[in-house]
Amino acid sequence: MHLLGPWLLLLEYLAFSDSSKWAFEHPETLYAWEGACVWIPCTYRALDGALESFILFHNPEYNKNTSKFDGTRLYESTKDGEVPSEQKRVQFLGDKSKNCTLSIHPVHVNDSGQLGLRMESKTEKWMERIHLNVSERPFPPHIQLPPEIQESQEVTLTCLLNFSCYGYPIQLQWFLEGVPVGQAAVNSTSLATKSVFTRSELKFSPQWSHHGKIVTCQLHGADGKFLSNDTVQLNVKHTPKLKIEVNPSDAIVREGDSVTMTCEVSSSNPKYTTVSWLKDGTPLKKQNALMLTLQEVTKDQSGKYCCQVSNDVGPGRSEEVFLQVQYAPE
């Protein structure tokens, strides 16, 4: 069965159903996979008295001829007693006044569809519906990145899975280029009526060398078995990273010789926009190419040279090269 994007939305809203007598709070849709379980946090309000009958239907349909709901009965509890579910998969963990929490363990693909909570008090009846989506295999978590990542600035990476269930422990683990990271990751779960999820947050101070690297969040079962994963490629904004090459390599020449300096841009994100050369900290005029050629040098051109390349993040500067121009005694 195709999973309808469980990572796309964190169910922060409530599903409300309200007649003049009934009100419910629960996640609108719950997600699980074959063999796992579903924990359905649920609260309700019945103003006319205590709950007398509760039936959990699978894909209920109202029959106008009988004025009753038809569908598979997964669980039933009346004032006369409880009717156990098949293999006791379904547990009603609520009460007769405000709690309608349910558990289905194990859950199967054919449980997907609509769950109907048929509630009856002494004078009122209500059918509350909850969507259940069960995939054949464990669905992947989803890595959430901040809008922009910049070198040396701490960011938080979030790995989110729209699943959590008591009695079915899982673990989210972080990897960078296949190497485990995330010893300081903060893990949390929610089984509230507002949302059901498992989350891991990793604080990370990326360097420019992390640009283009692969970050993975893996989902593991209680036995450590790999279940699924999500991967992203880091886009780390950084200033240009430079290296300067000189010919001759020792940067020692005689007056009248020529010198060539090349500014190599090993990395720049985003692409660089300007190039300049400096001698002893002062910009050289009309020198805005990656190659600087000095023809027939004089002793006055001895000094420290470097290149500076800028992008939208800022300027990057190479190491300095000391050019030594030898000359005859005057």
Curated annotation (Swiss-Prot):
Domain Ig-like C2-type: 141-233, 240-324
Chain sites annotated for binding N-acetylneuraminate: 118
Superkingdom of source: Eukaryota
Residues making up the signal peptide according to the UniProt record: 1-17
Key word Repeat present: yes
Residues exposed to the Extracellular side: 18-330
Gene Ontology terms: biological process: B cell activation; cell adhesion; negative regulation of B cell receptor signaling pathway; regulation of B cell proliferation
Alphabetized InterPro entries for the sequence: CD80_C2-set (IPR013162), Ig-like_dom (IPR007110), Ig-like_dom_sf (IPR036179), Ig-like_fold (IPR013783), Ig_CD22 (IPR056386), Ig_sub (IPR003599), Ig_sub2 (IPR003598)
GO molecular-function terms, A-Z: carbohydrate binding; CD4 receptor binding; protein phosphatase binding; sialic acid binding
Disulfide-bond pairs as recorded: 37-165, 42-100, 159-217, 263-307
A GO CC term assigned to this protein in UniProt: extracellular exosome
Pfam assignment, any one: Ig_CD22
Domain Ig-like V-type: 18-136
Membrane-related topology note: Single-pass type I membrane protein
Ranges annotated as spanning the membrane: none
UniProt keyword annotations, A-Z: Cell adhesion, Cell membrane, Disulfide bond, Glycoprotein, Immunoglobulin domain, Isopeptide bond, Lectin, Membrane, Repeat, Signal
PANTHER family according to UniProt: B-CELL RECEPTOR CD22
Name assigned to this protein: B-cell receptor CD22
